[in-house]
Structure formats: structure tokens, C-alpha cells
Amino acid sequence: MNKRSPHHAYLVRVQDIIDLSPNLRRLVLHSDELADYPHQFNGAHIKIFLARHGQSTPQLPQFSGHGFNWVEPDNKPIVRTYTIRDYDAKACTISIDFVKHGNSAPASAFAEQAQPGNMLGISSPGGPNPMLKTAARYLFAGDITALPAIESLLATIQTDACGDVVLLLPQVEDLPATLSLPAGMRLHTFYGDLSLVPALVKLVSTFAPLTCDDFAWIAGEATLVKPLRELLRTQWQLPPLRHYAVPYWRQGENEESYHAARHNFIEK
């Protein structure tokens, strides 16, 4: 078997479409090449490459030390960032969960209009490795965009783990019936929109502060992530190596317009 570069793009086909809730749709993606996919854990970041209008198949990038290279720059695809929900090496499939919000964004539009056989591209996985560090106590917090990663990570956490999971979801039906928590983990749910972020942050501030033996994993909309990261770093004095706090998106912006600000926030 030829050994691939650690950075590789895969052309995949929609194999199955599963509506998980009123606001989440899962696409199961297949390619024989995925038998050799460098998967290490669910919840890892990946790029998806979507064909432009009038195209049936997206152009895939070449990778260099400076990012993507495009053979035809004028025809490069729409690029978005998602997380791996599940990987099955035997079936050669990867599952990605998409938030459904109509045609207002290209990835959501693709997912809502998807048909078996539709093509897209995906990258090799990225992000911290490991994504989740062993800890005495955990804090998970996020909105519906972070839910697939949170559920994936909880599925692999040690059975004696303890801590808190705090979710902001559009409606109660978006809470997965498959969500499984160790007995020592407490679940806190808020149902509604971003106006509930202050109440969510207030709740988290009442928890016993995490220490250097603990770990926090936080993701979602920027106005949710920013105050929680401030709480972790300033009030709780939690070192950067003991938390992951990444804004996946910012209301009113797309991935291109938010890219620089997002990376500046992460790198602070």
C-alpha cells in the first residue's frame, strides 16, 4: 500500500442522509480511499470542499507547508471547517453532522439539498492531538455546532470521568437520545438562541473552579466562547494547555470574513 502524505484531500460521495433532529442532518460519506484515512479520534477538525455553482465535482487542493495550492485558482471550491462525527475504516465512511439553517450558507445548503451520489472533498484531520486530555474533572460547553464533537468525545471518555456538560441548543428535540454520559458527569441544557449566553456563562461561573489537573473543552459561537475562555483564564487561572476554547463561527459572518479574527482570538 502506498503511504500517503499526512496532508491529503479525498473525493467522497454522499452515501446516506440521516435527519438527527429538526436542526441537525448527518451525511455519511464514502470512498474506497477512506480505508487508508489517517483517523485518530472523532471530533477532529477537517476541511470540506464544495463544488461551485455549475460544477458537479469540486477541485481538490494540493498541500504545501503554506496551506492549499490550487491548480486552477479561479475554480477553487468553497472551503468550510467541520468535525468528524464518526469514522468506519471497514465501511470506508466518514460521518459529518451539519446544522440546518436553509440556503443562507453554502455548507448548510449542500447538506439540506444533498442526494446520494453527490460529491464533495474532505481533508485529512487536524486540530490538537489529543483533542481531549486525561483529567480529574472536565467541563464541556458549546452550542449545536459543537454538539457533534462533544458527543463524540464523551463517547470515548473514561467511565469514571466527572464534571459538567453545558449545552445551548435551539430546541429540546436537538438533544440526542444517543448522548451518553458517565455517572459522574452532570448535564445542563439551555434551549433557545444566543440571548441565553449570559445565563449559561453565569451558571458555569458557579461551578467549582477547574485546576491544573482538570480540562475544559469549549466551542461554538464567538459570543459564547469568549466569556467562557475569559472565565477559565482570568478567574480560574487555568493554563492554556488545560483547555480548548475555539469559536467555530460568529453570527453575521461567513468563514472567509471571520477567518483572520478567529485565528487572532485562538492565538492570543
Task: Locate the predicted segments by residue.
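Extended, composition-driven regions rather than compact fold-specific motifs
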Residues: M1-K268
